[in-house]
């Protein structure tokens, strides 16, 4: 994405110190689950959720940020455990947020497969990818 403008959200107060490192990158002190903060930012072609890693936090962040994905845009939840049956059961909940017609898929990451293969009982990790229609 050589022409991208990147906006980062971070709840840490010192995150804004990263501003000015590049002209097309800005960092805003904001919790991605805070709808009043996010509403001031506009809409985006591509959103990556690499924040809180619990299922509840990822659901909450998706619910807050999804309305700001432009039509044709992508929303990626990074570091999602392959919850298997839980993920399938969660489809009804996800559909309430993103709509029934929204395509999404789970993408296992090679790095995670390598890392978790040596840890029995640890689920494989990946990314959950949504495309706004």
Residue ranges and their predicted role:
Residues 1-133:
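S-adenosylmethionine/decaboxylated-SAM
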